[in-house]
A protein has these predicted regions:
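Conserved N-terminal beta-strand and adjoining loop/helix that marks the start
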Residues: 1-14, 35
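Conserved Nudix-box catalytic region and its N-terminal flanking loop in Nudix hydrolases
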Residues: 13-52
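A short coil-to-beta-strand element that immediately follows conserved catalytic motifs
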Residues: 57-67
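Active-site-adjacent beta-strand/loop module that shapes the phosphate/pyrophosphate-binding cleft
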Residues: 9, 67-93, 103
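NUDIX/MutT-family hydrolases
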Residues: 84-86, 94-126
Length: 133
């Protein structure tokens, strides 16, 4: 299981993170987040991952569930479930801690980015969240 966040700034832009070259889906843009560790809830993993990857502090109460996507059954790959949360409040300025490129994107341009397959169906809920600000 994986969690990710739609981080929306006061200008309505969404923070996207580029996957490292040499890894699966390398070079594609994704919502920041990461895998759950044993014993963690999804929201605990999201708060931890955003701190580790972006050096920001997010409170779980400031994150709203937006949707999920999963690898299709029988695709020959292991099952991956991606839980997406929306967040407008955090402390600190996002700075990549793992060398990944970051970019603030106008919400309307999300669908123009090259995204990993699991992120594609989550663009619609991300747009809805970004528009509600």
């Amino acid at each position: 299981m994986v969690t990710a966040a739609v981080l929306v700034d006061c200008a309505g832009r969404v923070l996207m993170q580029q996957r490292p070259a040499g890894r699966q889906h390398g070079g594609l843009w994704e919502f920041p987040g990461g895998k759950l560790e044993p014993g963690e809830t999804p929201i605990e993993a999201l708060v931890r991952e955003l701190h580790e990857e972006l050096a920001i502090a997010v409170h779980h109460a400031d994150c709203s569930p937006l949707g999920f996507a999963a690898t299709p059954p029988g695709a020959g790959a292991r099952l991956v479930v991606l839980l997406l949360y929306g967040c407008r409040r955090w402390r600190g300025d996002p700075v990549s801690q793992e060398g990944a490129a970051l970019q603030w994107v106008d919400a309307g341009a999300l669908s123009q980015l090259a995204l990993p397959p699991l992120d594609v169906p989550l663009v619609a809920p991300a747009l809805g969240f970004a528009a509600c600000g």
